[in-house]
Amino acid sequence: MPDPATYRPATGSIPVEPGVYRFRDPYGRVIYVGKAKSLRSRLASYFADVANLHPRTRQMVTIAAKVEWTVVNTEVEALQLEYNWIKEFDPRFNIRYRDDKSYPVLAVTLGEEFPRLMVYRGPRRKGVRYFGPYSHAWAIRETLDLLTRVFPARTCSPGVFKRHKQIDRPCLLGYIDKCAAPCVGRVGAEQHSQIVADFCDFLSGKTDRYARDLERKMSAAAEQLDFERAARLRDDLFALKRAMEKQAVVFGDGTDADVVAFAYDELEVAVQVFHVRGGRVRGQRGWIVEKSDDPGDTGEEQLVEQFLAQFYGEQAELDFVADESANPVPREVLVPCLPSNADELASWLSGLRGSRVALRVPRRGDKRALAETVQRNAKEELQQHKLKRASDFNSRSAALQNIQDTLGLSYAPLRIECVDISHVQGTDVVGSLVVFEDGLPRKSDYRHFGIRKAAGNGRSDDVASIAEVTRRRFLQHLHDQNDTNLLSPEGKSHRFAYPPNLYVVDGGAPQVNAASTVLEELGIIDVAVIGLAKRLEEVWVPFEPYPVIMPRNSEALFLLQRVRDEAHRFAITYHRSKRSKRMTASALDSVPGLGAHRRKALVTHFGSIARLKDATVEQITAVPGIGVATATAVLEALRPDSSEASE
């Protein structure tokens, strides 16, 4: 482990201007990015008294092997550069406020010809407008059920839309007037887009004009004695008002603001944000992240600065701003305290928004009351997380310690990798590699392998496949370790940058012996290898005649089972995907002269391979670009035992 004194720069060589600095580990990877008003003052504080640094910061300084910096002209430039570097390098010691994929949102796919309303979980995408997040998916479905009476926009999937377009018949929602049925041409793209725009306006807070419009239409229908239409409009108005009641007015002046609050202990920070648009709370979002203190920074001020820079930087990049209410950066951001560079932050946020953004601490009135509510939510979230953290941490620590003691390892296996092979009778043979760090899955390091040498033509050798995956994984690790030219100048991690402490194979003695032999051939002696057999959950050690038996109720065996089962799940998922692609594409792939474009045209025209198989030559030639010879070849490929293709 590097000694901070070995790479500490001379104080006089560090500039006093503002700038951004990067710490790198011995492999050249960027592990931390920070900024400072004075680079000299900030960097000197890292090395002045390492023992008194925050534990996470102290760990970073002792792992690092190099520090470098870039001087900028202003603090706004430093803020922007810091955000860009954190996004690019994903340093392991920086706090990351990633998109919370657990909360559902109401998504509107504005980038499509006929936009769709749907419940969505996952990372934000361009061309999609989001409302929420909501606490439960049923709350979104209930809102959609109410509002599609008034705004009958499409809610179906692309597959359902295409199918009903082909059969020229709307779905049930089209028959009960909860969808305008653009699939069958009841409305055109322009009319449907206007329905969606009205829906978005309503959810953005422009509610009153739609309620007044329905009341006016209802009165007009009653005056014309069209009581049936008046009754429908009455029901629509009732649905609209019910949807409005679900979003309580917190500010009567139509405020657009985000209210941010933090709760933290020595290790982690809980962040809560309430999104207020048009005076109504439109969504809530929360994170739990590890705490990381820079020397010389006040705790909460640093949290505010880091959160604003990362959260709004990412939101502004991901959202298309079609109108004022859709802007991801609100007019006002309410925070518990102002950082020292509040003016620079407000200026940067204003640049993202395109108009002035106010950064304030609420002191009194409704805004103060809402800020206190958000603060209570953050405290409650942290308290619940601490209870879960204590339980999870204790069980994970016990499991890792138990594995170390049982297997006689020098260190607890903080990084565990597991490999599994999946196939069906020797076809589509694939391998998977999953990674667990500190007892938790690290999905960004998962890898798939297509087996090249140990399988093919209907044959499969699990032992040889395990050996092939092991060899490919550790050969890449040796390249990363020994060939410095393979390290990117930006310090990005390679695919297999970190070796495991424990390498687990799914299988018994033959599989574990094969993996161990490969490591021995490669000269790797610091990685422990075991096999976990499914039948009796036995732990096999290389070249030992008998397995190690762990207690059935031990935390160690439970963790190893989780790792093995995750590798199996990952391998099965990839195998099924590969098999599905082969089975659906192979029939038309064999037709000579039929390229990808015309294959797609055929499937689009007929809707499925089954319908194409039942078609005649004349029907197939109706597809643009398909002649008689090609149509005949298609039928011969799909119906090799039928004589119709030659008729």
From Swiss-Prot:
Superkingdom per UniProt: Bacteria
Hydrolase is among the record's keywords: no
Subcellular location: Cytoplasm
Protein's UniProt name: UvrABC system protein C
GO cellular component, one term: cytoplasm
Domain UVR: 208-243
Residue span, GIY-YIG domain: 16-95
Segment forming the signal sequence: none
Major location category of this protein: cytoplasm
Gene3D superfamilies, alphabetized: 5' to 3' exonuclease, C-terminal subdomain (1.10.150.20), GIY-YIG endonuclease (3.40.1440.10), UVR domain (4.10.860.10), UvrC, RNAse H endonuclease domain (3.30.420.340)
SMART domains in the cross-refs: GIYc, HhH1
Underlying gene: uvrC
InterPro entries from the UniProt entry: GIY-YIG_endonuc, GIY-YIG_endonuc_sf, GIY-YIG_UvrC_Cho, Hlx-hairpin-Hlx_DNA-bd_motif, RuvA_2-like, UVR_dom, UVR_dom_sf, UvrABC_protein_C
MF terms (GO), sorted A to Z: DNA binding; excinuclease ABC activity
UniProt KW keywords: Cytoplasm, DNA damage, DNA excision, DNA repair, Excision nuclease, SOS response
Family statement: Belongs to the UvrC family.
A GO biological-process term: SOS response
NCBIfam families: PRK00558.1-5, uvrC
Pfam family, one: UvrC_RNaseH
Keyword Cytoplasm annotated: yes
Function as written in the Swiss-Prot or TrEMBL entry: The UvrABC repair system catalyzes the recognition and processing of DNA lesions. UvrC both incises the 5' and 3' sides of the lesion. The N-terminal half is responsible for the 3' incision and the C-terminal half is responsible for the 5' incision.
Self-association and partners: Interacts with UvrB in an incision complex.
